[in-house]
Amino acid sequence: MQLVLAAKYIGAGISTIGLLGAGIGIAIVFAALINGVSRNPSIKDTVFPMAILGFALSEATGLFCLMVSFLLLFGV
């Protein structure tokens, strides 16, 4: 029984590594936004909605990893 519990904790910890990728993705999206707007301020209205879409897609992958982690801890 202890081995199954240890495997759940290890699996949940490993599945949260995907949150690191989501954080890096969000940082890249907003770094590109800041870089683009600083070079051409008039394009802000065009680029900002795309940056929010990129943020949402990056965050969705992180939330999927978090959901898998919670399922491993509490669901199975």
Swiss-Prot record:
Its main location: mitochondrion. Changing residue 65 to S: In oligomycin-resistant mutant. Keywords: CF(0), Formylation, Hydrogen ion transport, Ion transport, Lipid-binding, Membrane, Mitochondrion, Transmembrane, Transmembrane helix, Transport. The record marks 59 as: Reversibly protonated during proton transport. The modification N-formylmethionine is found at residue 1. Coiled coil: none annotated. It is a multi-pass membrane protein. One of its GO terms (molecular function) is identical protein binding. GO terms for biological process: proton motive force-driven ATP synthesis. PROSITE patterns: ATPASE_C. Changing residue 57 to V: In oligomycin-resistant mutant and cross-resistance to venturicidin. It is found in: Mitochondrion membrane. Pfam families: ATP-synt_C. The chain crosses the membrane at residues 14-34, 52-72. Gene3D superfamilies: F1F0 ATP synthase subunit C. Belongs to the ATPase C chain family. Mitochondrial membrane ATP synthase (F(1)F(0) ATP synthase or Complex V) produces ATP from ADP in the presence of a proton gradient across the membrane which is generated by electron transport complexes of the respiratory chain. F-type ATPases consist of two structural domains, F(1) - containing the extramembraneous catalytic core and F(0) - containing the membrane proton channel, linked together by a central stalk and a peripheral stalk. During catalysis, ATP synthesis in the catalytic domain of F(1) is coupled via a rotary mechanism of the central stalk subunits to proton translocation. F-type ATPases have 2 components, CF(1) - the catalytic core - and CF(0) - the membrane proton channel. In yeast, the dimeric form of ATP synthase consists of 17 polypeptides: alpha, beta, gamma, delta, epsilon, 4 (B), 5 (OSCP), 6 (A), 8, 9 (C), d, E (Tim11), f, g, h, i/j and k. This is ATP synthase subunit 9, mitochondrial. The gene is OLI1.
